[in-house]
Design a protein with these regions (language model features):
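Nucleotidyltransferase catalytic core that binds NTPs
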Residues: 3-246
Length: 246
């Protein structure tokens, strides 16, 4: 890292001697933290991070559970544009789907939480050892964000289907308590005896199964996908082939 420091890179976080996260702006992360600090509140603050590709009734249930258990819920939407549903749409659907919860503060994750910089294997589906290192680095950055916002708990949805997210959750529950942050795993909301998942929603959008979508999406997301505005996104999903891990 000293070599990159000489080239004008600045360290943000490191995992022992295996990984270092650096950026080429002197105050990029500092400015991001100062911006976040404007939304810092007294009382119990918690965090939730979601990709929401797209925002489902499962996501809404998770946000409602977390919001009910704290004074302020900081909800970070993954802003890396590596998903079938573009970030601008994902954020809009999250915002619409949580509008009834006054104590939820929405944030963009920027390049600092689950991004190609901190956690590339989230998008690449790498092997376990690589995922482990990237997850630890991502969480090392997150603990600095948590300190800026006085966050003492992070909520996650139970993850039976995805190896990457399941491993990330496991490492989170090991690492965050060391930084004084409780890790709360919430059982998934079900429809017809199955956990609601965004991958099932993408499959239904691809095949045009609107009956199933009515059971999986909040009205706000459903209205969007039925509108002419959604046509470019639907075309992208229809043409994507395998949409399960996307």
């Amino acid at each position: 890292s000293r070599f990159f420091g000489d080239l004008g890179f600045y360290e943000i976080a490191r995992v022992e001697d295996t990984l270092v996260f650096m950026e080429n702006r002197r105050d990029g992360f500092g400015a991001y933290l100062r911006d976040l600090e404007k939304t810092r509140t007294e009382g119990k603050s918690a965090a939730l991070v979601m990709n929401a590709n797209p925002f489902t009734l499962g996501h809404q249930y998770l946000v409602e559970k977390a919001a009910a258990a704290c004074d302020t819920l900081h909800l970070f939407v993954v802003s890396e544009d590596a998903s079938l549903v573009p970030f601008t749409v994902r954020r809009k659907l999250v915002e619409a789907g949580v509008a009834h919860l006054p104590n939820v503060v929405l944030h963009d994750s920027g390049p600092y939480i689950i991004s190609n910089a901190t956690f590339p294997s989230y998008f690449l589906k790498d092997e376990a050892a690589v995922i482990d290192g990237h997850a630890r680095l991502d969480l090392a950055v997150f603990t600095k964000i948590a300190a800026a916002l006085n966050i003492t708990a992070r909520y996650v949805g139970e993850e039976p289907a995805s190896q990457v997210t399941g491993l990330y959750n496991q490492i989170m529950c090991e690492q965050l308590p060391k930084a004084g942050i409780e890790c709360v795993v919430v059982p998934r909301k079900e429809a017809n005896g199955k956990a609601i998942s965004a991958s099932t929603v993408r499959q239904c959008l691809q095949s045009g199964d609107w009956d199933t979508l009515e059971m999986l999406l909040p009205k706000t997301s459903l209205d969007y996908f039925r509108s002419p505005e959604a046509e470019p996104v639907l075309a992208r999903i229809r043409n994507a082939g395998n949409v399960v891990h996307y």
